[in-house]
């Protein structure tokens, strides 16, 4: 009794990181550097003086775009965070803090300001969102809904299943990767109607996770999943996927074009020597870069983002792509020639 036990640190302190100062709803005269300075003051005067035994419960964890490099753990002691969180170094000056916290910030996802608006003005009850979304549609009804509405067909299966066969022009963003962040980054409007193709039994999970980032307009799902679509005899598409070893052979013997869809810091840190950068979150800006004749290779770090990119390119009518299974990690392990490694913190 009377003893501090825990702190709910919100977006101020994360595990291994602190909140992004560029996301705050700020006055017009305040820069992100000003807000970073205010964050420094809050940490130093409100949180760091607390006892080391206190448990920290942050509002976000690994994978969230609200920070740069959060730990995968969900709770920790404040004492441990004081030891290992770069932003809580005891000898850190305010100027050093501002520089480190604002350095390398990627643009915030497009849905962030839309979510802020929803939080201020209110949003639909989730029971209604789920009732509308958890509507099973036969392949015929699903196809009709896709043709008659402006819905995106979103396939949330595993990437290894998607590449083997999918509904033409559907977009892949798998539940087993960074699902919500990529939905938010790639689908511009939170009011966009969505038709789902999900693994059996995970339809409600998909609708729920979409809703958590403001995408409340799922209008149904394909009953029986992709297998039902295929069994009905409807048109299917595939993504040509090859091993890293075969990709290296194509690069070295045929000088095949390579596109790296990782983010810019990842690419600058180390990349396949002949690869061009085409970050997934800016893919539409690079459409003219992809060759119209001859095959080209697409890879990311491990194979998730490259399949997202491939599905987007195919939906835009670009079909001469080949996905590299396992991504940059497999290319490295298979002996691909790469640029010299540069520590990301020095970029």
Mark where each language-model region is.
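Protease-associated
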Residues: 134-144, 152, 158-159
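Core dinuclear metal-dependent hydrolase active-site scaffold
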Residues: 1-7, 131, 135, 141
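Conserved G/P- and acidic residue-centered "switch" motifs that form tight phosphate/ATP-binding loops
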Residues: 11, 155, 303
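Rhodanese-like catalytic fold shared by cysteine-dependent sulfurtransferases
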Residues: 20-22, 29, 33, 80-117, ...
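Short, conserved clusters of charged catalytic residues that mark active-site
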Residues: 38-42, 137, 178, 242
């Amino acid at each position: 009794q009377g003893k501090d036990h825990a702190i709910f640190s919100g977006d101020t302190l994360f595990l291994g990181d602190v909140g992004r100062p560029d996301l705050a709803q700020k006055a017009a005269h305040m820069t992100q550097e000003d807000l970073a300075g205010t964050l420094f003051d809050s940490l130093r005067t409100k949180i760091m003086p607390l006892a080391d035994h206190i448990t920290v419960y942050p509002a976000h964890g690994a994978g969230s775009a609200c920070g740069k490099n959060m730990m995968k753990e969900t709770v920790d002691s404040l004492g441990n965070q004081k030891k290992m969180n770069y932003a809580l170094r005891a000898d850190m000056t305010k100027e050093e803090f501002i520089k480190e916290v604002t350095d390398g910030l990627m643009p915030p996802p497009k849905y962030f300001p839309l979510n802020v608006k929803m939080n201020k003005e209110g949003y639909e009850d989730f029971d209604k969102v789920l009732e509308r979304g958890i509507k099973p549609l036969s392949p015929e009804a699903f196809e009709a809904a896709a043709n008659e509405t402006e819905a995106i067909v979103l396939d949330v299966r595993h990437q290894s299943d998607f590449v083997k066969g999918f509904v033409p022009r559907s977009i892949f963003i798998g539940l087993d990767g960074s699902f919500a962040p990529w939905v938010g980054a790639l689908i511009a409007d939170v009011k966009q109607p969505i038709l789902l193709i999900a693994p059996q039994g995970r339809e409600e999970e998909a609708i729920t996770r979409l809703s958590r980032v403001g995408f409340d307009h799922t209008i149904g799902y394909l009953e029986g999943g992709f297998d039902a679509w295929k069994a009905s005899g409807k048109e299917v598409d595939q993504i040509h996927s090859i091993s890293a070893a075969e990709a290296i052979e194509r690069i070295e013997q045929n000088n095949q074009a390579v596109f790296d869809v990782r983010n810019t810091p990842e690419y600058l840190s180390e990349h396949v020597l002949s690869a061009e950068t085409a970050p997934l979150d800016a893919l539409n800006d690079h459409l003219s870069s992809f060759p119209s004749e001859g095959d080209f290779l697409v890879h990311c770090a491990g194979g998730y983002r490259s399949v997202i990119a491939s599905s987007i390119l195919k939906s835009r009518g670009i079909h001469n792509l080949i996905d590299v299974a396992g991504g940059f990690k497999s290319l490295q392990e298979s002996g691909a020639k790469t640029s010299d490694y540069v520590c990301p913190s020095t970029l």
